Amino acid sequence: MSPRRKLSDARRRQILKAAVQVIAEKGLCDTGIKDVADQAGTSPALVIYYFGKKDVLLAEALSFADERFYAQTAGAVAALASARDRLVELVRCSCSVGEAEDDFDEWVLWLDLWARAPRDPDVARDRAAMDRRWRATIAEIVRAGQATGEFAALDADVFALRLGALIDGLAIQVVLHDPEVSRERMFELCMDTCARELGFSWTTENQAAVTQAVRRSAPDGRAAG
């Protein structure tokens, strides 16, 4: 890759990172191109050059946040020996349990994306692609657990659809600050569903063991995510 291309890609990532922060804080309707440019330390003209309009910026910002999520969790999940532990860690990361408050920013962007998808075919296409990837990730772990006898026999794709929908629904309540649905409660409800449908035992003690295993595998000794 040429130095110019590297610089161009770096600027684009810088703008996307800024867009995630600003849209999560203000919402897409109240976010202007200048707001993103100011956060990124660049000009509005450059933001328009890369993305053209806000809907494109939203979709690409969420895709950027999605890639960041997979990059942060892939190593931690892969390092765990059992499919059950990999599923537990994947769900924990999606619930942002034990993470900083702004680690839930991606879910705030999803709300804006869902609101726009019915009226914008491009946004709808991006939404569908990200959901397919997420469900496939869940289904892959389920099939691995079925192959080792850890999980009960069921349709992995249908289970992934149900779990993905449950996570989405509970995440909305967390974003809305529902007093009955904290991130920890979201995680517990998701894991109760996983354990019941897949036929394995899960307790908070199980989660502590998974967290310790993730920390041992992380280069700096901290849980990934």
What is each model feature region?
Residues 2, 52-56, 78-82, 118, ...:
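Residues in soluble alpha-helical coiled-coils and helical-bundle/repeat scaffolds
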Residues 4, 124-128, 132, 146-194, ...:
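Hydrophobic/aromatic-rich alpha-helical bundle segments in the mid-to-C-terminal region
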Residues 11-20, 36, 61-65, 69, ...:
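Generic hydrophobic, amphipathic alpha-helix propensity
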Residues 14, 22-56, 60:
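Helix-turn-helix
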Residues 18-19, 40, 145, 160:
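Small-residue (primarily alanine) positions within well-ordered alpha-helices
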Residues 25-29, 79-80, 148:
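Short coil/turn segments at alpha/beta junctions that flank glycine-rich nucleotide-binding fingerprints
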Residues 60, 74-107, 159-163, 187, ...:
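Hydrophobic alpha-helical connector segments
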Residues 86, 101-124:
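Amphipathic alpha-helical segments used for helix-helix packing
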